[in-house]
Curated annotation (Swiss-Prot):
It catalyses: RNA(n) + a ribonucleoside 5'-triphosphate = RNA(n+1) + diphosphate. The keyword Transferase applies. Its EC number is 2.7.7.6. This is DNA-directed RNA polymerase subunit omega.
Length: 92
């Protein structure tokens, strides 16, 4: 089991409270949404992976926001394409 200290992660984010929010969002992406880790897993839980990514400067609130906006754009584009296909009378 890996030991992770949050001090380096806090330095990357700025304060403990924002670090917790960022780590929770990223851990949820890994665990629930199936996003790939940006660091070696080493049989770690998603929260530990998220903290390691933050420590290395790979993840912050800005990168998570950008990723979320991109996902929304892709989902909206797929919905528009589906509606257009239905309107044209063909199925997907």
């Amino acid at each position: 089991m890996a030991r992770v200290t949050v001090e380096d992660a806090v330095k990357q984010i700025g304060n403990r409270f924002d670090m917790i929010l960022v780590a929770a969002r990223r851990a949820r992406q890994i665990a629930v949404q199936g996003k790939d880790p940006m660091v070696e897993e080493q049989n770690d839980k998603p929260t530990v992976i998220a903290l390691r990514e933050i420590e290395k400067g790979l993840v912050n609130a800005g990168t998570l926001d950008a990723d979320e906006r991109q996902s929304v754009r892709e989902r909206e584009a797929a919905e528009i394409a589906a509606v257009a296909a239905i309107a044209e009378g063909r199925s997907l």
